[in-house]
Amino acid sequence: QRVIRKGGTYRARVRMRNGTMAWSHWSPPVEFVAGEPDLAGLRAGLVFNEIMYNPLGQAGVSAGEFEFLELKNIGESTLDLSGLFFSSGISFIFPEGSMLASGELFLLGINRAALQSRYPGLVVNGIFEGKLANEGEAITLSAGIGAPVLSVAYDDAAPWPEQADGQGFSLAADR
């Protein structure tokens, strides 16, 4: 059950805590109509750039510790990823202030130390929960109450490249 329904009219009042943790007075009521978020910029500019779903392991570190997913902003404007979340596949919520400038990458992994030992200098922006399915799956990034922003379905069978299935290679966007 949703708390707020699209098209519904609502009134809200807010208060906040200041730096000394004292509460402010309540604001005057504000009336609004709930609508869909504007996702056009995100949908046009954000892509799955690389997916390492079935990596090779190494001595003392299981293969799954090297999984990662990389997003890229291919648009011309900075994108605000704050509050976006994965509604299928892995589990991760982008924290407030997650901005992605044009051309920048945002890499999520399972184990920061393992990834940085294999790829020195790699910036790991966040740690996801769960695991990328070695047999393939759909990964969906969503906003708000679940509006899809970006989705990809990969597989470990043709026409997908076999080298990405446990042979040390990742799936990379073809642009």
Regions found by a protein language model. Name each.
Residues 1-7:
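Recognizes extended acidic, P/S/T-rich segments that occur
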Residues 8-9, 19-23, 28-175:
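Activation on beta-sandwich/Ig-like modules and their edge loops
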